[in-house]
Swiss-Prot record:
It catalyses: pseudouridine(1915) in 23S rRNA + S-adenosyl-L-methionine = N(3)-methylpseudouridine(1915) in 23S rRNA + S-adenosyl-L-homocysteine + H(+). This is Ribosomal RNA large subunit methyltransferase H. InterPro entries: Alpha/beta_knot_MTases, RlmH-like, tRNA_m1G_MTases_N. It is an enzyme of class 2 (transferase). Belongs to the RNA methyltransferase RlmH family. Its EC number is 2.1.1.177. Transmembrane segments: none annotated. It is found in: Cytoplasm. GO terms for molecular function: rRNA (pseudouridine-N3-)-methyltransferase activity. Homodimer.
């Protein structure tokens, strides 16, 4: 199974690149994890936000292909670490690759939400999208460590 983080936005701050890459390199060869960045639509004073969201959504869904789609969204299910580890195991047993979708400043398009098989909420707080990338990478790595009894996670 391959994990894929599909996120709106490019040109992240160095701390995001450093943090994300640190967890990316830790993933085992049998569970590769990759980042696909979708360029954010140009937002201005008179921007057509619906059109921008729709275009970003089309690109995200195209990148995900036939993968299981899991959206990251405030109204999603709040998994704790053991629950995420259980989900990771279920995804592995399912045999399909998994695409986790992070929207831009206005969130995800209706098409992305409709295509999602699952929706995960990291927090009831609104989090900056660059930070979410690092949190997701660390959370998935921690979940993997639980499923393999790796010492990274301690009870």
């Amino acid at each position: 199974m391959k994990l894929q983080l599909v996120a709106v936005g490019t040109k992240m701050p160095d701390w995001v690149q450093t943090g994300f890459t640190e967890y990316l390199r830790r993933f085992p060869k049998d569970m590769p994890f990759e980042l696909i960045e979708i360029p954010a639509g140009k937002r201005g004073k008179n921007a057509d936000i619906k059109r921008i969201l729709d275009k970003e959504g089309e690109q995200m869904l195209a990148a995900a292909g036939k993968n299981r789609i899991v959206t990251l969204d405030i109204p999603g299910k709040p998994w704790d670490t053991p629950q995420l580890a259980n989900e990771l195991e279920r995804w592995k047993q399912d045999g399909r690759d998994v695409s986790l979708l992070i929207g831009g400043p206005e969130g995800l398009s209706p098409a992305c939400k409709a295509a999602a098989e699952q929706s995960w909420s990291l927090s009831a707080l609104t989090l900056p999208h660059p930070l979410v990338r690092v949190l997701v990478a660390e959370s998935l790595y921690r979940a993997w460590s639980i499923t393999t009894n790796h010492p990274y996670h301690r009870e």
